[in-house]
Amino acid sequence: MKKSNIIIIILSLLLTGIVGYGLGKQASSRPVEQTVNNATTFEHWNEDSEALKELIAYVEDVTDENSENFIPAVDRVATFDMDGTLMAELCPTYIGVKMLMERIFNDPSYEADEEMREFGLMMRDHAMDKSFPSDFDYTFSSHEAKAFAGMSLNEYSDYVTGFLLNDADGFENMIYGNAYYLPMVEVIDYLQDHDFKCFIVTGSDRFFIRTFIEGVIDVPYENIIGSDVELEAKDQGDTENYVYEFTGKDTLVRTDKLIIKNIKTSKVLQIAQEIDRKPVLSFGNSSGDVSMHNYTITNNGYKSAAFQLIADDDVRDYGNSSKGKELRDKWEGMGFVAVSMKNDWKTIYGENVVKTGSFHWLEDYADE
């Protein structure tokens, strides 16, 4: 599973030019191995991590056929947020924001209008201190939809693939395509080995995440639920979908119409519509995931749990260690298991990845 993302990216470009749709691990009826060797299964976690112990105890309980808390494999559903839960969001901001900035200011094939450039400048000025306007989550995705409108799905995948080859701002020895949390990839592998069906439920663009996880996170593409833009046939024009007849010569393209921003209660609605089973495990890191957590642990017919990551590592990442206790108290008070990136993980991105302590963000997008 742990193939190098860069190899996958290069092979994708050279051999196919598109991102393929793979199949994930399927549930089986094989007996569950109850003994976990932390040194090999969770080599990126500290062995004394209480959060890890709680996760292992939970899984061993609900996969034991003799336990009163046994959950049949068909109902073992785990949902994961993406940004800040499986991949970096502090270099210096969301990776999707960085890609949109590149599209607006550094892509010669795209001519941003004045309103788009103004939005880009706003992102530039607020990214460093995370002081985005309160409606930023939605307005970002609506501008993202506009910036990539007209691209076919393959063209968009290729664009994302090329962007992911760029060096991650604020780090040495890491490209954006490798900016994922190694300990959390181990969690997905572990759960799938115990017949859990893992879903990524993210506020990021669904197709962006499909490309990002290729060769990194072994989750089937159909198990990715994200923010969506409307698609249409390239030559469809103003004809409604229920009228237009798709032909073998047609190509699907992205439009500038945002269908859904998949955060907060939208995540709950999407889970109900697309999975049709309530999760028994939920993993997130922010207020945007609280609704998904509450949906998981409230009125569930099975034993359930929610895990909330805390970005408190200011040595290996750009977290805020001073807020660690405050956030732990907050999340545990809501019934979630708190995971400290600082104290629970041996590494975040790998020992060779080094935090530089500075960003090129402002100089990259300085006024001309």
Model segments located where?
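Electropositive phosphate-/nucleotide-binding environments in soluble metabolic enzymes
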Residues: 49, 150, 265
